[in-house]
Amino acid sequence: ILNSFYSPIISIDREKKSVDIFINKVNQKVLINGDGILDNWQISINSSVKDQLSSRQDSLLLTGCLTLANIDIKNIIISAENQHCEDAVNLIRTSGTISSLIIKNSLNDGFDADYSTLDVEIVNIMNSGNDCTDLSGGFYTLKLINLYGCVDKGISIGENSQVIIDDTYISETKIAVAVKDSSQVIIQNIDSQNVEICIAMYRKKQEFGPSYGLIKQNMCDSNSINFIQKGSYYDG
């Protein structure tokens, strides 16, 4: 089920399995949810809005310009550009596979996944005003991640998440990878350049505990040493 708010421009081609969304007003958002499976669809969202939203979330508690919630997905492609919401793309309680995720020029976070189980082939995110990737409360496997120009964190992992990453390339970012709040991450290979801190591990919320991080091949060039809060385990 596709729900829109404040009438964004939407074009759906069921034969090609494509959804094209254009946002031209600050409060416009799109929510895709419901029973069934979204199989081999391509979703694209663009925007001409330059202003910040006055509130982080709306009356429906949606933070994404594009939100997928309570839905199964298979081999979908998502692209988002010039988004102004708290999250350009937000997946909530979503399970399945993403073939490609491309996000450019987000005013705040690029990709945010909450309480989901996802297997993602390719992630390309450029120029996010906060975090490029935020993974919370779920199980996530990512094959290839390319991140550039993340004002705060390249990859933020929290709320008891379990994450496996094969290869990630991160540059022009404050913190390459942050692991928080009882989360676990295994990264096969990381290559980071022009970052302030490679790895930060800490507890942000009192109800959680320390975290675990393992990086098998670490080629990270940072300006400062890693921050590993007492109790967390890091091998890299």
What are the roles of these predicted feature ranges?
Residues 1-236:
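Extracellular beta-rich repeat passengers
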